[in-house]
Amino acid sequence: MKIKMKFFSIFAVVAIMLSFAFSTLDRKIIVIDAGHGGIDFGASVENKTEKEIVAKIARKIQVLNLSSKVEIVLLRNGDSKMDLAERAAEVSKINPDLLISLHVNTSTNAAKNGIEAYVYDKSNFYEQSLEIAKGLVKAISNENLSEGKIQNARFFILRKAECPAVILEIGYLSNTENREYISSDSGQSVVAGRILEFINK
């Protein structure tokens, strides 16, 4: 009886370890890079700052994630300044399945509005990045954020990423309607929820 109990105990431990190993292998790691931070405020209009808005959206994405198959890693957790080289090095160390860098736009044209995205067309992951960018822009756009274009760009974080990578420009602070929406708790929750919903597809 003791031998049988010992056998079943060992079997149970092995089964748990194998289950954990396979669940870890199946898990996607998504890095969310909240742009700017610290003394770098990014875009700023009427006391609304880019660094604060994107940090709040990033945190909401992490908090809302209940999937065991997706791990959300925040590149900037808190109001700290990280230069581009530090960000790229940290992303490389994490080795994620996807990098999403969150930003907010601004323009001298106050009528300009909506969500846009950037990808790097010389990346080994260009096709994947482009499809992800299209999907994210479509998923987030609504009556408050119009569906904007996808552009190619040589931004440092995109050039250095060794995985699919997208920069999201979530609305225009210079546009009154966009500013009110993306600076509100409800608007940020909707944006975060739609990003997460797309990731979990």
Where are the regions a protein language model picked out?
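Active-site-adjacent substrate-binding region
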Residues: 127-151
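Catalytic-core regions of hydrolytic enzymes
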Residues: 25-134
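Active-site-adjacent mobile loop/cap segments within catalytic or ligand-binding domains
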Residues: 31-33, 42, 101, 105-109, ...
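Conserved beta-strand segments of alpha/beta enzyme cores
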Residues: 71-73, 116, 146-149, 164
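Bacterial Sec-dependent signal peptides at the C-terminal "C-region" and cleavage site
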Residues: 5, 10-28
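N-terminal secretory signal peptides that target proteins for export/translocation
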Residues: 1-3
